[in-house]
Regions:
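Detector for outer-membrane/organellar transmembrane beta-barrel domains
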Residues: 216-255
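Outer membrane beta-barrel
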Residues: 21-48, 59-60, 64-186, 203-204, ...
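Extracellular loop and loop/strand-boundary signature of outer-membrane beta-barrel proteins
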Residues: 67-70, 105, 148-153, 189-197, ...
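Solvent-exposed, glycine/polar-rich loop segments of beta-barrel outer-membrane systems
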Residues: 46-55, 235-241
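Sec-dependent N-terminal signal peptides
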Residues: 4-13
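Sec/Tat signal peptide C-region and signal peptidase I cleavage site
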Residues: 15-19
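A short secondary-structure junction signal
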Residues: 143-144, 179, 187-192, 223, ...
């Protein structure tokens, strides 16, 4: 009697799963991207020049020659990428979906290795949506310059994808966004250099709240972001270690 009972249980699980497969649709996308660049002057940059920030100031040698007045260039395919979009079944009255996207940027100076760009699940109720996973930081809004270069307006436009939980309310013509944000690839700087330990030790995520008004061909909005970090838990004075309690909190506004 045990075998038919087990078989019945397996069928009761398998049949709903088989039925749910029909509710899933997916599509792959991607690109092979080559970036060839030539700079007439030394610049502040990351990814060995692929992500341009701004030109460096004069730096003179003993003869008065500007050391930064030198050209450079290279060719990379690190930002070739592959992505998957999945539209899932309704969960209650919410439409479920997920996105997974990778490129070959790597992290730090470890280039040409796989890196997660986007990885999230989204539940959409129409006017309400809840997203959990990694995607664009809320400060990277819908308004940004269209350009061939990867920097998309950096350092003034924050180019950042982070793990977050985001809620959006979208009545007609309006968009209200609230998010709790953590750090993974884009890290705060502190006593030990760039590290995720400062926000981890803080035990408090970064918070964002913003509102946008959209019309035909125009958009205006405002937002505020609060980041509170614990830069260290201990310090050393005269060879002795002491426990410390520190917190650094910053507020950023956008318009």
């Amino acid at each position: 009697m045990k075998q038919p009972l087990i078989l019945g249980l397996l069928l009761s699980i398998a049949l709903p799963l088989f039925a749910q497969k029909k509710a899933f649709t997916y599509s792959f996308y991607g690109q092979v991207r080559g970036d060839l660049y030539v700079e007439s002057r030394a610049s502040q940059e990351i990814v060995d020049g692929l992500f341009y920030l701004y030109p460096k100031d004069h730096a003179y040698d003993a003869d008065g020659n500007d050391l930064n007045a030198a050209a450079s260039g290279n060719f990379y395919l690190l930002y070739s990428r592959l992505g998957l979009d999945v539209k899932g079944p309704n969960i209650g009255s919410a439409q479920s979906s997920l996105k997974l996207e990778v490129d070959f940027r790597g992290s730090g100076s470890n280039w040409a290795t796989l890196r997660i760009r986007h990885a999230y699940v989204n539940l959409d109720w129409g006017k309400h949506a809840l997203l959990a996973g990694q995607t664009w930081h809320p400060l990277f809004g819908d308004v940004f310059p269209q350009m061939l270069n990867l920097s998309t307006g950096a350092p003034f436009q924050p180019f950042n994808r982070s793990p977050l939980v985001r809620y959006r309310f979208q009545p007609q013509g309006w968009q209200l966004t609230a998010a709790a944000v953590w750090q993974l690839q884009y890290l705060s700087n502190g006593p030990n250099g760039k590290s995720e330990e400062y926000i981890k030790n803080s035990c408090v995520p970064e918070f964002y709240l913003g509102i946008d008004r959209k019309g035909d061909g125009w958009q205006v909005g405002a937002g505020v972001d609060v980041l509170s970090l614990t830069p260290r838990k201990q310090t050393t004075i005269d060879g002795q270690i002491f426990k410390v309690s520190e917190r650094v909190t910053g507020v950023t506004g956008e318009l």
